[in-house]
Amino acid sequence: MIKLIIDGSEIEISEGSTVYQACIQAGKEIPHFCYHARLKIAGNCRMCLVEIEKSQKPVASCAMPVSKGMVIHTDTPMVKKAREGVMEFLLINHPLDCPICDQGGECDLQDQAFRYGKGTNRFHENKRSIKDKYMGPLIKTAMTRCIQCTRCIRLANDIAGIEEIGAINRGEHMEVTSYLEQTLDSEISGNMIDICPVGALNSKPYAFKARKWELKHTASIGVHDAEGSNIRIDSRADEIMRILPRVNEAINEEWLSDKNRFCYDGLKYQRLDHPYIRKNGKLVEVSWSEAFKTIMDKIKSVKPEKIAAIAGSIVSVEAMFMLKILLQKLGSNNYTVNQFNYKIDTSERGNYLFNTTIVGVEKADLCLLIGANTRQIAPILNSRIGRRVRIGALKVVRIGIGHNQTYKIQDLGNDIKIIEDLAIGTHEYTKAFKEAKYPMIIVGDGVYGRDDGYAVLSLIHKVVDKYNMMRDDWQGFNILHNHASIVGGLDIGFNTTIKFEGIKLAYLLGADAIPFDKLKSAFIIYQGHHGDVGAMSADVILPAAAYTEQSGIYVNLEGRPQIAQKAVSTVGGAKEDIEIIKEIAGYLKIDIGMDNLQEVRIRLAKEYNVFANIDKITVNKFTKFISIDKLSKDPIAARPINYYMTDVISKNSVTMAKCVEAHEERKRDVAKVFY
């Protein structure tokens, strides 16, 4: 620890810290633009100037390391004059367009100019003007406002792992650009909007829509992947205006994937707002009571063993739990959350979780990806891995044909035999696994989505056992889930498989990706919020609330339960999920024993310990899985996905459709250059 004096007070701080960090620790307010705690230091805005005794000039505190005995002053006349001068230079070419700038009201330059500026203007020459750059359908640019802090460049390089933004020219001619002015090839590009301290980079879908003070803020959870990123839903009246990240150091830090951030406009289109019944081959709008009576009559006419329920990819735990209780009361145990027929082992909870945890990745020194596309399945997790790789703290190897993950990977091949050789210790990489202190394996849908998934998983468990990856001080076995509701469904006992043969009544709770050809003879009830495949195949449609219109628990891939709060009202005549299921039970004269959301959560916490620990990770058991299934000779490969359209909300998002089109155009442009 190093002792130093700041404004007359002595503090201690760890060696290697900067003067800026010491000042913040001492409770001092230091203005800054280029500095960001999660980015490399640039030191080019000069706004954080402080006075250090024995130094002839003010010093940029963000770039100066502390040393023993330093005496620092943060509020002297020299410091004040220096900051006023820096602010004056920053404003020389900055346009006075705050009234039409989307950053107005939440702009660092506005705030700091008011607090630290002179309040007068001595510059009477012409301001420079810069042509706006194209960065895709998500980011709107106004580069004349840019103050060259280079935050966006550093985020692209260090966090996103794409070297597609940089600065050209020098001095007053410097410009930040994407070089070829293409759509940015990143799943987390929207974070550049958040870290831009001025209005140079703004959200294109949100442009000219609202001001910060008009919005209501609601804490929620991103449901478009299984990471459980913490989000803030900003709404006005009953319309969602934008979605921003909330800080959670254990999960998403302060970053957010583009899909979770921008696909909210999908909540406006193709919504189900009234119940429907199929009559003479056509869906006809009916009352809720008629829909419930039709369901009651049909359920009473079907044997319990012929009834099945399938939960979709963005359904809350409470809704699944209510549906499970209803089916059990009817005498059926045929319910699943696995509409994709994934081969998932549920022997113990640790067998289907990301046990290392998202933040735990930063402790690993060797990572093996098997059939996993972390970049598109879990962009925030992938960013953490990439940062560790780029500083040389983590080595990543891969089995399976894969995509560019934005960091260096050593490919071992795509043959099943590689896993077999690792399991018996004859592979050339055996030594590296033995020497690694904290090795980890990430198993993706390229394994559990195979027909022989159980056999491959059994083989991977042998590798885990061989190199002692699951022990008291380290859990290195990880399943990379790609849907928000899977872990929660498995936690409450939903099955991993379902028998479609002989089903006479199928209850689809937001499920749109099942093989509908196997349900041709079944009566289908669809409870959901979008008119997608499930609704089009249904005999009865029950319009439900989306995740933004009801409160619900979601368990992320590492097994952490979190609550998504209700932000806006339901659309039309739609109802919340648990209310619909409760009313069906009422028509059937079945007592579920829970009348409201609070009672559902109390019962969940009593029956499953994990739900008594919201926002926490519980200790989980892991057991070696053995399968006698036969291995196929098919190569291992991560399943191809359309990242921007993976559920009913993102599929109905105009913004996501524009992203798909823009990335296809980018591929065509690249093909023209190389072919």
UniProtKB/Swiss-Prot annotation:
Assigned keywords, A-Z: 2Fe-2S, 4Fe-4S, Iron, Iron-sulfur, Metal-binding, NAD, Quinone, Translocase
Binding site for [2Fe-2S] cluster: C34, C45, C48, C62
Phylogenetic classification of the source organism: Bacteria, Pseudomonadati, Pseudomonadota, Alphaproteobacteria, Rickettsiales
Residues involved in [4Fe-4S] cluster 2 binding: C146, C149, C152, C196
Domain named 4Fe-4S Mo/W bis-MGD-type: residues: 215-271
InterPro entries: 2Fe-2S_ferredoxin-like_sf, 2Fe-2S_ferredoxin-type, Mopterin_OxRdtase, Mopterin_OxRdtase_4Fe-4S_dom, NADH_UbQ_OxRdtase_75kDa_su_CS, NADH_UbQ_OxRdtase_ferredoxin, NADH_UbQ_OxRdtase_Gsu, NADH_UbQ_OxRdtase_Gsu_4Fe4S-bd
Family designation: Belongs to the complex I 75 kDa subunit family.
Protein's gene: nuoG
Highest taxon, organism lineage: Bacteria
Single GO biological process annotation from the record: ATP synthesis coupled electron transport
Pfam families: Fer2_4, Fer4_NDSU1, Fer4_Nqo3, Molybdopterin, NADH-G_4Fe-4S_3, NADH_dhqG_C
Protein name: NADH-quinone oxidoreductase subunit G
Signal peptide segment: none
Organism name: Rickettsia prowazekii (strain Madrid E)
Positions of [4Fe-4S] cluster 1 binding: H94, C98, C101, C107
Swiss-Prot/TrEMBL catalytic activity: a quinone + NADH + 5 H(+)(in) = a quinol + NAD(+) + 4 H(+)(out)
Assigned GO CC terms: membrane
Stored SUPFAM superfamilies: 2Fe-2S ferredoxin-like (SSF54292), 4Fe-4S ferredoxins (SSF54862), Formate dehydrogenase/DMSO reductase, domains 1-3 (SSF53706)
Residues in 4Fe-4S His(Cys)3-ligated-type domain copies: 78-117
2Fe-2S ferredoxin-type domain residues: 1-78
Function per UniProt: NDH-1 shuttles electrons from NADH, via FMN and iron-sulfur (Fe-S) centers, to quinones in the respiratory chain. Couples the redox reaction to proton translocation (for every two electrons transferred, four hydrogen ions are translocated across the cytoplasmic membrane), and thus conserves the redox energy in a proton gradient.
Cofactor requirements of the protein: [2Fe-2S] cluster; [4Fe-4S] cluster
